[in-house]
Design a protein with these regions (language model features):
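Short glycine-/small-residue-rich flexible loop motifs, especially phosphate/cofactor-binding loops
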Residues: 43, 95, 120, 232, ...
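Hydrophobic faces of well-ordered beta-strands that scaffold small-molecule active sites
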Residues: 132, 167, 299-301, 320
């Protein structure tokens, strides 16, 4: 009876998801919605490099430089082999691989919709909050954060199961999200999803500061802030509560998610600040080591930390995910002709192909 009920709830969640996606109300922007953006990006990078750009299909392009050519499908390039791509997509396997090498990863458990007991037990041992996600996936699809009860575990598992039958539950890690781009073994760029911040005035409680800021937000037509779980969790790891009076001029983070209109389910990570120079050598080396362990020459290493200037072991931060074929639209300003990273990637691919061609001729 219980399994039948879960199956019906999963069916209802799937139909709702399809309706929201079809109607454009899901709040999700997928790669198919960025075809024109990536076409312009790769075209501009090819021209800057002195190459020829050709459209093979609406979402498939070719760049030639002399006798060397490469192709890309939206954000996907010719880096990495299928085995590496498959490994990187298996989150539990990556956690085990990185954890065994001494890198910081989240505490986690693997479970399925057919057997929720491991997830229930894990949540009970992490009452401050958990994250439930499909064991394979990208872009926040099927992910629910700040899970704090059995009912929420079940609901989050149903959503995650729409994307994969193997599921993960992880301890919620305090901090902000960072994406470190590793190209050919070297970290070349980093961005951060900065959460909204407020400044204390030495007289008002945080609760009062939020009320005042929401007045401004209403006047400006912005989404209001509220004291939800993300807010309370974020304040708590800074040693704050809604009733704390913060010293005048002291800034504090109010929440980890910068999209105040969305809550905990399928929140897209929108990086809004370049922080390459803020990442300490220890975290930089961790990201580069993660890429070597996965075997990827082009990897996005996702880190959660309170402070990128100190090692993860000091801040309690983690490497929470790795992404092959990392999306370059995270790594440039919209007003730029193309991300400098696109040029670096294109140069690297063409150079590798030229070397391979030369080796083939010599052989």
């Amino acid at each position: 009876m219980r399994r039948r009920l879960l199956a019906l709830q999963r069916l209802a969640a799937g139909l709702k998801k399809k309706w929201l996606d079809w109607s454009g109300r899901s709040g999700q922007t997928y790669f198919l919605d960025r075809v024109a953006e990536y076409r312009e990006m790769w075209h501009a990078a090819a021209i800057a490099l002195g190459g020829d750009f050709t459209s093979l299909a609406d979402d498939l392009w070719q760049v030639e430089l002399g006798s060397v050519r490469t192709r890309m499908h939206i954000h996907q390039t010719e880096f990495d082999n299928p085995a590496v791509l498959e490994l990187a997509g298996k989150k539990a396997a990556v956690h085990r691989l990185l954890g065994a090498a001494g890198l910081a990863v989240p505490r986690y458990a693997v479970f399925s919709l057919a057997d929720l007991e491991p997830a229930y037990l894990f949540q009970q041992s992490h009452p401050e909050g958990c994250v439930v996600k499909p064991a394979n996936g990208y872009g926040g699809q099927g992910v629910t954060t700040h899970v704090q009860s059995r009912t929420e575990v079940r609901k989050a598992a149903i959503l995650a199961s729409l994307y994969d039958m193997e599921l993960l539950i992880e301890a919620q890690v305090p901090g902000e999200s960072y994406r470190l781009l590793v190209l050919e073994g070297r970290m070349v760029h980093a961005v951060c999803r900065r959460g909204p911040r407020l400044k204390g005035d030495g007289a008002s409680t945080i609760r009062q500061l939020i009320v005042a800021d929401n007045t401004r937000r209403r006047e400006d037509g912005e989404s209001e802030l509220d004291m939800d779980r993300d807010c309370l969790f974020t304040l708590a790891y800074q040693g704050l509560t809604p009733d704390t009076i913060v010293d005048g001029g002291t800034s504090f983070i109010l929440r980890s998610v910068n999209d105040t209109a969305r809550k905990y389910a399928e929140v897209r990570t929108v990086y809004n600040e370049t922080v390459t120079g803020l990442v300490c050598d220890s975290i930089r080396h961790d990201a580069e080591r993660a890429a070597r362990l996965v075997g990827s020459d082009f990897l996005g290493v996702d880190v959660i930390t309170r402070d990128p200037a100190v090692p993860l072991q000091v801040s309690g931060g983690v490497i929470n995910e790795v992404n092959t074929t990392p999306a370059l639209h995270h790594h440039y300003e919209p007003r730029a002709r193309f991300p400098e990273m696109a040029l670096l990637v294109l140069k690297a691919i063409l150079r590798r192909k030229a070397v391979a061609m030369a080796a083939g001729k010599e052989g």
